């Protein structure tokens, strides 16, 4: 099948994004695994986020490319391809929400934080959040799908009954997942509320931090620790903001499709392609933010790339630098 120029460009850009997403987020996971300074509950949630982004590069983007070509397949196979990215998106949102709550506790109750948020509890929470993400993302399999309309043209069997269970459909996202699910359940129910909650949490974090910084009785050490927490919160708020900017265009188009179908029919194909590319590009951004905002991540990235990519031997001064870096173990 020969691709049009527009489709070929879309596929090429998706493949570039997939490669960068996998490489960058595998590097994040390796950095946390290799550096004791990065093995904090906050970063466990970031590893969960990175895992979702790796899966976007390995699976969701190839699935999206497949769906964009509109090949014929059975309904439930196409539905799985369409829903898998919803699972990963929901997992990312839950991971970001968990990080926001974690940072709020670190600033609101600093003396009790280490007892409340342990590595074991963080890993347990991550497991629960992934189960919830799969449940939410695969909800269309429970019946909230477009099977009746997608298979309405199936040929009837000899007894006059259409065999819809094995009827091939043109595998396009809107052919299998109804916009009512995407807008009312996915966006209004599962995406927008967590984003608004995170907005409130980060506003509260900065309000609490500013009040504490204004207290004259704060000792120099406590003040330095709090400033590091504020720096971490700013970095994480930046990640949430980038996530919202990357994903809201897709949801805006879905809302237009549902509420103004006549207007949606006239939209060029490239508009949706650009929105999808932007949402997938979000999986590339986070490692860049970590490297730019956090010395521990930056040092660990450099160490891993030097040793395993450039095949350079580690210098003797490396352990000393790692020791100096390990004093900052507050996430970002």
From Swiss-Prot:
Compartment(s) where it occurs, according to its Swiss-Prot or TrEMBL record: Cell membrane
Disulphide-bonded residues: 78-171
GO CC annotation: glutamatergic synapse; plasma membrane; presynapse; Schaffer collateral - CA1 synapse; synapse
Extracellular side: 1-8, 68-78, 145-178, 260-267
SMART domains assigned: 7TM_GPCR_Srsx
Keyword annotations from UniProtKB, A to Z: Cell membrane, Disulfide bond, G-protein coupled receptor, Glycoprotein, Lipoprotein, Membrane, Palmitate, Receptor, Transducer, Transmembrane, Transmembrane helix
Regions of this protein lying in the Cytoplasmic compartment: 34-43, 102-121, 204-235, 292-332
Family: Belongs to the G-protein coupled receptor 1 family.
Name of the protein in its database record: Adenosine receptor A2b
